[in-house]
């Protein structure tokens, strides 16, 4: 079974949101995936300056885990750690989550670059994740 870990990383490389698909990932494996994601942040920064696209595709690999990235205009990073390569599904996932993220930014009660704690946002990301993965 393939697992997908999705993270939203803030401007100061602080985690804003994290979710795993399916939810049955062991805690030990979660820490390894967080370590892999953190290690790829410098690579994301390099790719941002080389491309005009928000979707950076697969930027790095670690063993069987591939890391795809999407960077917003405000330099918020979306990372997806995955084993299977399905570019269309990954790009569509990023675009739909980006739309949700923009709605969060429009919320007057949300502080920019702070962790996202909205249960509605979480439920919608889960729904999008099950749709594509």
Swiss-Prot record:
Q: Subcellular location, in the record's words?
A: Cytoplasm, Perinuclear region; Endoplasmic reticulum; Golgi apparatus
GO terms in the biological process aspect are: endoplasmic reticulum to Golgi vesicle-mediated transport
Under Pfam families, the record lists: Sedlin_N
CDD domains per the UniProt record, alphabetical:
TRAPPC2_sedlin (cd14825)
Question: GO cellular component terms?
Answer: cytoplasm; endoplasmic reticulum; Golgi apparatus; nucleus; perinuclear region of cytoplasm; TRAPP complex
This protein's UniProt keywords: Cytoplasm, Endoplasmic reticulum, ER-Golgi transport, Golgi apparatus, Transport
Tell whether Transport is among the UniProt keywords. yes
Q: Does Mitochondrion appear among the keywords?
A: no
Database matches in PANTHER family: TRAFFICKING PROTEIN PARTICLE COMPLEX SUBUNIT 2
The entry assigns this protein to a family as follows:
Belongs to the TRAPP small subunits family. Sedlin subfamily.
This chain's function reads:
May play a role in vesicular transport from endoplasmic reticulum to Golgi.
Q: How does it assemble?
A: Part of the multisubunit TRAPP (transport protein particle) complex.
This protein is called what?
Trafficking protein particle complex subunit 2
Q: Which gene encodes it?
A: trappc2
């Amino acid at each position: 079974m393939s697992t997908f870990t999705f993270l939203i990383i803030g401007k100061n490389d602080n985690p804003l949101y994290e979710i795993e698909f399916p939810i049955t990932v062991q805690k030990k494996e979660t820490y390894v995936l967080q370590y892999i994601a953190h290690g790829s942040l410098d690579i994301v920064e390099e790719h941002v300056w080389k491309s005009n696209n928000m979707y950076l595709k697969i930027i790095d690999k670690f063993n069987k885990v591939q890391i795809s990235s999407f960077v917003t205009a405000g330099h918020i990073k979306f990372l997806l750690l995955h084993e299977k390569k399905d570019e269309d599904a990954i790009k569509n996932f990023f675009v739909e989550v980006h739309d949700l993220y923009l709605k969060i930014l429009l919320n007057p009660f949300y502080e920019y670059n702070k962790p996202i704690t909205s249960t509605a946002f979480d439920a919608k990301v889960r729904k999008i994740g099950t749709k594509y993965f």
